[in-house]
């Protein structure tokens, strides 16, 4: 699939051209270092991210030099490309396979809208709910989520406020329009236009367009080995936080995988503004004083409740109950660290892309409160 690219700057004038040539040579040399590093030490996610961040700084500094040179020659300033394509979600959607491509022995997809919970395990959260799988009392949880967010983002800031990343970046979705999937489909791909990176891209673009400076890391933390992916993603996040201490929110974007005993895959779905979307579910970890060390879990819980309230209030039926459980997921790194499941492996990619946009719009609403 063709990658989307930002609009270019037009033809540079002589001084800018010289600076541009210098940029090209510098980036070529840096890419050569990247290749040599990959040969010597292998595709370690933390190393990849360090090189990516270094290359990003080099590019930004060189682009600034080109810009300053162009200004000296009174070049016409290039128009800044919008963060979100003018076509909205349509600009991101991909062609899906029709039933003529359905293979023999295809597996079944079952669509279901998962409702908000009720009963002793569930705590109301605006129009949504929180499923409490911990020993923290419901009364305590209900009181905690009435507190304000533990951080304040800066709107239209030059400094990053949000980081989106993917511990299991290679998770993907079905590419069929019909309710079937291919036999042997492992629901994984390294193609960033088809896996979790594509969903994260929509979310980051939506947030940036609203004035929330958001970074999106596309490191494949679960490739080539699934084992150790959370250690890999932790190193990645720590590098970003070291380089950009302004970051308040870290979102680990995944998809779920719900399957019946006979192999049918579940697709959590809802309809928003006439278009089918995947349902989403926030997971917030809790400290248990032994195996899960999250002493500031209450801060993340407040954030989870605010986001859940905003999303379900805007789009009834869009969210599944927040899962509050003894999970770690590196949620000790910021007071705004959460994991969100965008649909499941039974959803098609377009449902997930749309859900990513809706989840980001819900986050914008929550942060404006």
Give the label of every model feature segment.
Residues 1-11:
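N-terminal Lys/Arg-rich, disordered targeting/topogenic segments
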Residues 17-248, 257-262, 357, 365-369:
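N-terminal catalytic or cofactor-binding beta/alpha core of small enzyme domains
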Residues 163-166, 214-216, 249-252, 281-284, ...:
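Structural recognition of the beta-strand scaffold that forms the well-ordered cores
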Residues 169-172, 220-224, 255-260, 287-290, ...:
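Solvent-exposed loop/turn segments at secondary-structure junctions
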Residues 237, 262-270, 322-328:
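Alpha-helical scaffolding within the catalytic cores
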Residues 319-369:
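Active-site-adjacent mobile loop/cap segments within catalytic or ligand-binding domains
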